[in-house]
C-alpha cells in the first residue's frame, strides 16, 4: 500500500457525517467480514467507523496519485442508479475511464472483443455521418439504434486500449463481475464498501454508505480531485524540466558559439 504522503484532506469526519457516509445496512443484512469497520449498532442499523473511513480515504488519495504518477489509467465502475451520473461526470472531469451502464463481460479479460465493438461503433458513426448513402430509411434507423446502444455501453471506455492500473468500484456486490475480472488480471481494486459487502476481493477498502448519493459523491470527488491535482503537478514538473533543458541547451550553444568565435579570431591573427 502507498505511504501516507498527504497529511491533510479536503474532507473531514464532519463532512462524512453530513453526507450520511456512516449509515450501514440493517443488522439483519450484513457481512460479518465487515465487522472490523463497524463502530456500533444503532436502532437496527450498523454504524460505520468514520475514523477508519477517513484513514482509508487518505490512503486511497495516495494510491490514485501513485497510479497517475506511473502514467497508468484508472477505471471507475458504478452502474447503480445513485452512482451513474456523478461517476460519469467526475470521471470525465479527471480524464479517466468509466463504466456507468451495463458491465459487458470481458471488458477487462477480453479487451480485444470490446475493441471490436468500438470499431463497429466507429464504422456506424462514419456511415451515418456521410448521410447513409445507399441505405433505406429502415436500415438507417437500425444503424442509429445500434449506435445509441453501443455508445451507451462503451462511451466511457472507447479509448481504453490496455487494462487500467486501478479499478475503483461503487458497491462491489453489484459490480462483482468487474471485481472478478480485475482480480483475475491482478489489477488492484479500490471499492466503496458497505456493511453488506464482502471486502475480501477488494485490495483497498473504503468502508462507507454506498447507497447515498451524497456519500458516493463526496468520496469520488475527493479521489477525482487527487487525480487532477497529480496530473497538474506532473504537467508543471514536465514544463520546468523542459525549461531547464532549453536553458542548458542555450548555455551550451552560447559556449560553443564563443569557442567558435575565439577560434576564428585566433585564426585571423595567425593569417596576419
UniProtKB/Swiss-Prot annotation:
<feature type="region of interest" description="Disordered">
    <location>
        <begin position="238"/>
        <end position="272"/>
    </location>
</feature>
<keyword id="KW-0689">Ribosomal protein</keyword>
<dbReference type="GO" id="GO:0022627">
    <property type="term" value="C:cytosolic small ribosomal subunit"/>
</dbReference>
<dbReference type="GO" id="GO:0006412">
    <property type="term" value="P:translation"/>
</dbReference>
<dbReference type="InterPro" id="IPR018130">
    <property type="entry name" value="Ribosomal_uS2_CS"/>
</dbReference>
<dbReference type="InterPro" id="IPR001865">
    <property type="entry name" value="Ribosomal_uS2"/>
</dbReference>
<protein>
    <recommendedName>
        <fullName>Small ribosomal subunit protein uS2</fullName>
    </recommendedName>
</protein>
<keyword id="KW-0687">Ribonucleoprotein</keyword>
<dbReference type="GO" id="GO:0003735">
    <property type="term" value="F:structural constituent of ribosome"/>
</dbReference>
<dbReference type="InterPro" id="IPR005706">
    <property type="entry name" value="Ribosomal_uS2_bac/mit/plastid"/>
</dbReference>
<feature type="compositionally biased region" description="Basic and acidic residues">
    <location>
        <begin position="255"/>
        <end position="272"/>
    </location>
</feature>
<comment type="similarity">
    <text>Belongs to the universal ribosomal protein uS2 family.</text>
</comment>
<dbReference type="InterPro" id="IPR023591">
    <property type="entry name" value="Ribosomal_uS2_flav_dom_sf"/>
</dbReference>
<dbReference type="Pfam" id="PF00318">
    <property type="entry name" value="Ribosomal_S2"/>
</dbReference>
Amino acid at each position: 500500500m502507498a505511504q501516507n504522503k498527504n497529511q491533510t484532506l479536503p474532507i473531514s469526519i464532519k463532512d462524512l457525517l453530513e453526507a450520511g457516509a456512516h449509515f450501514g445496512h440493517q443488522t439483519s443484512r450484513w457481512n460479518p467480514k465487515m465487522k472490523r469497520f463497524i463502530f456500533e449498532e444503532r436502532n437496527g442499523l450498523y454504524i460505520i467507523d468514520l475514523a477508519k473511513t477517513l484513514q482509508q480515504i487518505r490512503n486511497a488519495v495516495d494510491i490514485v496519485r501513485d497510479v497517475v504518477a506511473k502514467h497508468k489509467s484508472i477505471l471507475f465502475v458504478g452502474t447503480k442508479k445513485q452512482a451513474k451520473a456523478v461517476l460519469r461526470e467526475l470521471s470525465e472531469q479527471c480524464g479517466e475511464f468509466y463504466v456507468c451502464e451495463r458491465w459487458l463481460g470481458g471488458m477487462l479479460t477480453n479487451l480485444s472483443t470490446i475493441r471490436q465493438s468500438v470499431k463497429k461503433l466507429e464504422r456506424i458513426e462514419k456511415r451515418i455521418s456521410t448521410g447513409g448513402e445507399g441505405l433505406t430509411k429502415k436500415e438507417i434507423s437500425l444503424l442509429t439504434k445500434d449506435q445509441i446502444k453501443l455508445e451507451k455501453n462503451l462511451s466511457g471506455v472507447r479509448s481504453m486500449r490496455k487494462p487500467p492500473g486501478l479499478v475503483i468500484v461503487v458497491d462491489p456486490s453489484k459490480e462483482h463481475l468487474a471485481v472478478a475480472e480485475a482480480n483475475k488480471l491482478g489489477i488492484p481494486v479500490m471499492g466503496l464498501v458497505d456493511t453488506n459487502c464482502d471486502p475480501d476481493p477488494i485490495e483497498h477498502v473504503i468502508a462507507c454508505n454506498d447507497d447515498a448519493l451524497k456519500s458516493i459523491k463526496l468520496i469520488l470527488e475527493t479521489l477525482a480531485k487527487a487525480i487532477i491535482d497529480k496530473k497538474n503537478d506532473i504537467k508543471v514538473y514536465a514544463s520546468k524540466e523542459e525549461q531547464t533543458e532549453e536553458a542548458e541547451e542555450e548555455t551550451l550553444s552560447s559556449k560553443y558559439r564563443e569557442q567558435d568565435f575565439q577560434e576564428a579570431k585566433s585564426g585571423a591573427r595567425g593569417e596576419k
